[in-house]
Amino acid sequence: NAYFERPQALAAIAKAIAEAGKSGAAKMRYIPDPDSPGQQICTTPGMPQDVRISPDGSTFYIADMMVDGVHVVDGESFKQTGFIPTGKGAHGIYPSRDGKSFYVANRGSNKIRGTPNGPGSVSVVDFATQKVTKTWEIPGGGSPDMGNVSVNGKYLWLGGRYDDTVYRFDTDTGAVDKIKVGREPHGLTVWPQPGRYSLGHTGNLR
């Protein structure tokens, strides 16, 4: 998290990061928030990828491929309020059409250049409880990246970045179909999508 406008926290953050580097620990590390008694600041170096907002607009969810999960950030204060472990290389986030849950594409690698047949998966997270309710593994391994939910909500389509594949997940059962495509499909857009105006990237419309 970026709290660099607050000098009183810098020394503690720097110390925590240095200790994490010495120990080689990749786990989440927290220090007390000097501005908010009882709250903590995450100091673990990471690489945020995708960002989505809750249906009520109160909370941001940020996938982080270096810490294998999703940061939960309050939309009013911009402070982290939680963390949801999902899977290795958490990358893309896609809300379900009913607005009750969201899907997290775990790319199966913490590296920019991964390898085929990694431990890729999709985590289903409940918006209300902020807990993982299901995990859909990919038989034989895979690397789900970016994509879209179909307009009727029945399928989650994702590019398989390191496997030259596109995945289609059944959102009821988690069953996955694979389509071989060209090299390193990063993202894809399923059409049509609800909305009129494109906000960029893979099918973000409003």
Describe the role of every protein-language-model region.
Residues 1-206:
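Predominantly soluble domains enriched in secretory-pathway, periplasmic, or organellar proteins
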